[in-house]
Amino acid sequence: VPIYSYVNEKIKKLKEIYKIKNLTISDKPVFINGETGTGKRVIAHLIKEISQSEKFIEVNCSQFTDELIASELFGHTKGSFTGAHNDKIGLLEEAHNGIVFLDEIHALSLKSQKTLLKAIEEKEFFPVGSNRLVKSNFRVVSATCENMEELIGAGKFREDLFARISTFQINLLSLKER
């Protein structure tokens, strides 16, 4: 019971600090920015818990190449590329009526950003190698430790995608500032 009280107290403080409760009323995208180790993942999970979303699909964008991220997000059909021995449901389809958490979103290439933008805007996409249109209603929560304005200015991140994923923004304090 003492650990439960401790966790509840921490959650109350986080809600208060970041006004997270207001974010859970809506299904609009949330963008979390903060240095490594500041709790971006914790905030994303907290949004999921407070919004009582049943599904929470987590994707670390920095661990995939362009080809693999497309397959992971959108799925693929058997034979669509070497090694595609079976059909695979994409994580965006799996996140239907739930939340997809795109961690380290800054790591996506411009090509992947373009495809993701279309899927976010239209809530539909084609799996790799398929002509079957998949519709999926998902909420995007994304995070990065990078300065997005600098990346946009340098042409490394699409301004239109950033506008779509950052309806609500949470800027976490650095560890020094805390």
Language model features with spans:
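Charged helix-capping and loop-helix junction motifs
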Residues: 153-157
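AAA+ ATPase active-site-proximal loops
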Residues: 2-135, 140-147, 151, 174-177
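Interdomain coupling/hinge region of P-loop NTPase helicase/AAA+ cores
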Residues: 166-178
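Short amphipathic alpha-helical segments, especially helix-boundary/capping motifs
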Residues: 65, 164-166
